[in-house]
Each structure stands twice: as structure tokens, then as C-alpha cells.
Amino acid sequence: MLEEFKKFALKGNVLDLAVGVIIGGAFGKIVTSLVNDIIMPILGLVVGGINFTALEYVLTEKGSEPIVLRYGQFIQTTFDFLIIAFSIFMFIKVLTKFKKKEEEKPASAPKPSKEEMLLSEIRDILKEKAN
């Protein structure tokens, strides 16, 4: 059973998936930082100094705890998603372009088999004798 698991875990697809998940997690952190620390402050400045993470709507009812709808945080998370989705789209587009270029390369002429080479030699010898 251990051997079976070892074969499964060391297959190329499983390792590729693991690497993809790790890189994807790190990329997600980079995008979150980009949105939180660069894009949203600039966007907040453009629209009048608004801090999007602080945007919220509070629903209150007498005698109960208030319910807070943090729509600013939702806007920020939506920006995260859009940037990640666009980045993945561009990556797939570039990857597809490279794959198409590889497929379009003409295949080199196949090397003649031993039989074909022998037949060519026999033909050449017969031509020489005829002349």
C-alpha cells in the first residue's frame, strides 16, 4: 500500500498540482496586498478620500445586536477576484499561444529506413552499370 501511495504521489500531475496550489496561494497573497495597499488607497483618493474597508451598513432593531453589512470589504474582495481571474486568463492565453507555435512547427522528414537506404544504393549501382 505504501508503494502504491508513493507511485501516486510522485506522478507528474500530482506534483504539478501541488506546486500550482502553493504558487497560487502565494500569488493570492501578492494580489491581496496589491489591492489592499496600492489600488484601493488610490481609488479611495480618487473618489474623495474614502477608505473602502471601512464602508459598512448597520442594521439595528430594538433590543437586539446590530447586524453589520461590510460592503466595502466585499468591494475589495471583488477587486482581488477580478485581478486574479484576469491574471489567470492572460497566463492561459500566453500558454495556449506557445502550445500552438509548438504544434505548428513542421515535422522534419523522417529518416529513411535501412531497407530504403539499401534500395537507394542498389538503384545507384544499377545506374552506374547502365552507363
Swiss-Prot record:
InterPro entries for this protein: Mechanosensitive_channel_CS (IPR019823), MS_channel (IPR001185), MSC/AndL (IPR037673), MscL_channel (IPR036019)
Transmembrane segments: 8-28, 30-50, 72-92
Record's keyword annotation contains Calcium: no
Entry keywords, A to Z: Cell membrane, Ion channel, Ion transport, Membrane, Transmembrane, Transmembrane helix, Transport
MF-aspect GO terms: mechanosensitive monoatomic ion channel activity
Topology with respect to the bilayer: Multi-pass membrane protein
Pfam families: MscL
Subcellular location: Cell membrane
UniProt superkingdom: Bacteria
Cellular component terms per the entry's GO annotation: plasma membrane
Main location class: membrane
PROSITE patterns tied to this protein: MSCL
Subunit-structure text: Homopentamer.
Family the entry assigns: Belongs to the MscL family.
Function: Channel that opens in response to stretch forces in the membrane lipid bilayer. May participate in the regulation of osmotic pressure changes within the cell.
This protein's name: Large-conductance mechanosensitive channel
The organism of origin for this protein: Alkaliphilus oremlandii (strain OhILAs) (Clostridium oremlandii (strain OhILAs))
Gene that this sequence comes from: mscL
